């Protein structure tokens, strides 16, 4: 595998040279790795779809410093293998595996590499699964955790826990997450765990909640159940899809935990492992609010994310051997303090002109619209929940006739608060890097650098890990004289089959098992391995340890 091979030698030699994937980049320095005196921990926090300007606005809104301010250490370049502006799936892949990838790809190598300065991927390696830092932590014997305020199967948490050629493959992602045996998993997405008729319900007929119970997880559904759990294995599924925005929670879903509460509980649970832990945390819905240009939603969940960062940093300060990284995966919306209203008067406009209109809102646009009656008879009251408490006749008429009321509401509030937006999509700027603890990263780095820094701190090499965890099953069995096929009779449950004489091996998709059958002795045995079986549409990939059971 040629892609990203530079990292193997660079990181084994030193912890100094970063920005491997770009042409004419300045050399970036990372602190030399300190030899740990006790097990290492890593807490990786991602504020999805935020931007530097959004953080600035949130600080003004809060009226004081953010927890993130204390650990600001550099910047991150976010482009993907094919674009200056990345999607969340390749961004997560970069942060988790050290490989830039393509739009919609989760934890697999790209098929197209066109961004300047990147090495091409060998044709046979396109779509190949690549190991992530959570999988590496597991191999080191560490406890692992995964948290998100979106569905836990969403692109960014998926990038740290699964491998799929399209981020929309929730069935595959959910099943892989269950069979990864992650110790603590907290977020939304319960509908992808069981069969049903809803959009993201399972189509393969498998009930993963039953599997979790068989694996002795404490399966919790509410804040109180989570906080009262004493189990070392917790799966918290608090909503069918995403959790509520932080600002809306008290009124719309009071039984859901906050991001900070989930983070604190995960740390308290994982820290008991004598080998240390890896924890991934995502504040997911900053991105969703930015796509809508919902200023209140952006601020709501940046501040919620900041509370989670405080939980992580407070623990790291006490522990002394925990690396904390906080970052956004990409910009979104082009939000600015200042718009066409301020073009000639910006130098005399006080902070209050931006913040006071925003302070009137008590809910995000999503939360406010959840209170709208079907006949829209309470439209004025709903607008007031979003801070629009003094609608003009023209504004009210606009809302009444709007095809998308929320779209008009966010425009009105942004105009009153002098907030500008350039897009409803992602943006390509460099973003802030926040880091704390041993081997703190500084300077302007690539998103891929963060994965390699975390891996090195925990004591493994990601490229070697990929070679151990994901080998092509076809070659492995054919080299031993087996005939092989991929059985697609059940399209929702592909399986790899290898046969020789009376022996048959069956490898189910997304699980961590292999079934051995010998017809001559009527023997059947199930082997369990250290990683999941991944099917990328053309090939099955399995752990190298499978070679130990092939006769």
Where are these regions (language model features)?
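Cofactor-binding active-site loop characterized by glycine-rich and histidine/acidic residues
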Residues: 12, 29-36, 84, 92, ...
């Amino acid at each position: 595998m040629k892609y990203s091979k530079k990292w193997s030698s660079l990181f084994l030699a030193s912890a100094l040279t970063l920005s491997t994937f770009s042409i004419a980049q300045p050399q970036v320095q990372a602190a030399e790795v300190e030899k740990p005196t006790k097990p290492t921990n890593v807490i990786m926090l991602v504020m999805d779809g935020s931007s530097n300007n959004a953080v600035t606005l949130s600080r003004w809104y809060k009226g004081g410093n953010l927890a993130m301010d204390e650990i600001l250490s550099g910047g991150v370049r976010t482009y993907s293998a094919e674009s200056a502006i990345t999607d969340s799936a390749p961004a997560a892949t970069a942060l988790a595996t050290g490989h830039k990838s393509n739009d919609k790809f989760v934890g697999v190598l790209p098929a197209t590499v066109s961004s300047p300065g990147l090495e091409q991927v060998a044709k046979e390696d396109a779509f190949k699964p690549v190991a992530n830092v959570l999988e590496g932590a597991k191999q080191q014997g560490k406890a692992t955790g995964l948290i998100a305020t979106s569905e836990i199967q969403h692109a960014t948490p998926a990038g740290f826990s699964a491998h799929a050629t399209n981020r929309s493959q929730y069935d595959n992602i959910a099943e892989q997450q269950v069979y990864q045996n992650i110790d603590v998993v907290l977020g939304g997405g319960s509908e992808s765990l069981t069969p049903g008729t809803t959009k993201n319900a399972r189509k393969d007929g498998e009930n993963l909640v039953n599997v979790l119970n068989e694996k002795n997880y404490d399966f919790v559904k509410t804040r109180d159940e989570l906080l009262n759990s004493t189990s070392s294995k917790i799966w918290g599924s608090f909503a069918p899809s995403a959790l509520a925005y932080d600002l809306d929670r008290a009124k719309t879903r009071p039984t859901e935990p906050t991001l900070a509460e989930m983070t604190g509980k995960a740390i308290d649970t994982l820290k008991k492992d004598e080998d240390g832990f890896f924890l991934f945390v995502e504040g997911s819905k900053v991105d969703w609010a930015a796509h809508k240009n919902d200023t209140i939603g952006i601020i709501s969940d940046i501040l919620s994310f900041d509370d989670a960062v405080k939980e992580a940093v407070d623990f790291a300060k006490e522990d002394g051997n925990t690396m904390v990284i906080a970052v956004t995966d990409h910009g979104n919306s082009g939000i600015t303090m200042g718009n066409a209203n301020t073009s000639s008067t910006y130098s005399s406009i006080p902070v209050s002109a931006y913040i006071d209109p925003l302070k009137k809102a008590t809910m995000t646009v999503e939360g406010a619209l959840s209170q709208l009656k079907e006949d829209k008879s309470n439209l004025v009251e709903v607008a007031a929940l979003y801070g629009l408490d003094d609608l003009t006749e023209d504004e009210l008429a606009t809302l009444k006739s709007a095809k998308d009321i929320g779209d008009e509401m966010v425009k009105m509030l942004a105009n009153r608060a002098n907030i500008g937006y350039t897009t409803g999509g992602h943006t390509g700027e460099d973003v802030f890097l926040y880091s704390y603890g041993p081997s703190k990263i500084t300077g302007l780095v690539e998103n891929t650098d963060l994965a390699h820094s975390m891996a090195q701190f925990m004591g493994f090499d990601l490229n070697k890990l990929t070679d151990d965890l994901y080998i092509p099953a076809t070659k492995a069995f054919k080299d031993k004289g087996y005939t092989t096929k991929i059985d697609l009779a059940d399209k929702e449950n592909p399986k790899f089959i290898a046969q020789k004489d009376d022996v048959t091996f069956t490898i189910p998709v997304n699980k961590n098992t292999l079934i051995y059958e010998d017809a001559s002795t009527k023997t059947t045995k199930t082997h369990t391995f250290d990683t999941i079986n991944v099917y990328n549409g053309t090939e099955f990939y399995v752990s190298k340890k499978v070679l130990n059971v092939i006769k």
